[in-house]
Amino acid sequence: MVVEQSGYVEVMGFKLFYRSFGAGDNTLLCLHGGPGCPHYYLLPLTKLANDNFRVVLYDQLGVGCSEKPEDLTLFNIERGADEVEGVRKALRLGQMNLLGSSYGGALALQYALKYQEHIRKMVIASGLSSVALTVSEMTRLKTQLPKETQEVMKKYESKFAFLHPEYLKAVDEYYHNFLCRLPEWPEDVKRSLNELSVPVYFNQNGPNEFTIIGTWKGWDITARLAEIKVPTLVTVGRYDEVTPKVAETIHRGIPGSVLRVFEKSAHLTMWDEAEEYLHVVKEFLAV
């Protein structure tokens, strides 16, 4: 039976909730996306844990079970990278493997630019290096939806009526095509989405995945990717909202990186093709 622990660590003056599965010095630290989407949807990755390999998940500041300060200026990706380093130190992870999903993939890249000496291997799971490129690709994906759905989106986006029931229904159709393609979404996925931290998400991101008007709308580190020297696996779904073009940009930028496209997956590859995804990550990390 895999050892499981949970608790809080104090990082940069705030309490952060973590969960640890498995044991040993070889660790995979997983960064959730959103920004503001708690760790639950990443739980399939804990199947990699055993007596010699540890998987650690945590909720970022303002998210899930972690402390929720009112100061919105604390929610930014640069501070987030320092927070990752604080978690590594607080849990005494030493040199670690790092996996970032979606926004967490962007956060992993930001972390690597400053702290890559602490990374053994890195997995960028449907992550991004440029918000502008990603928004452009998401806008393109919207044109693949039925015409009536596109018209509904245009109508309410022009009015900034992002909470209108008709608009939310259209967004839900987008998500079932490009976020998770399973006919019935798993409870852990629904829980992460239902418990999304609205202050974090709206402040950094915006009202939804493809309307990014928050503080990180101009974020782009593509030109600096060549500075990253750690072995890196870039994964993406064929139907991913953070598209293969975005993944290919990261792959081309990081010397020696490996790109793997999952042909039946949308954004949540660890759910859409769970068994194959875990196999690929396990092989890369040589767990």
Residue ranges and their predicted role:
Residues 1-15:
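N-terminal cap/lid segment of alpha/beta-hydrolase-fold proteins
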Residues 14-68:
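Conserved HGGG/HGGXW glycine-rich cap/lid loop of the alpha/beta-hydrolase fold
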Residues 57-103:
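Active-site loop/oxyanion-hole signature of alpha/beta-hydrolase fold enzymes
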Residues 94-137:
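Conserved hydrolase catalytic core segment
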Residues 121-162:
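Flexible "cap/lid" loop of the alpha/beta hydrolase fold
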Residues 143, 151-230, 249:
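Alpha/beta-hydrolase
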Residues 215-265:
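Conserved loop-alpha-helix segment in the C-terminal half of the alpha/beta-hydrolase fold
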Residues 256-287:
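Catalytic active-site module of serine/aspartate enzymes centered on a nucleophile-bearing elbow/loop
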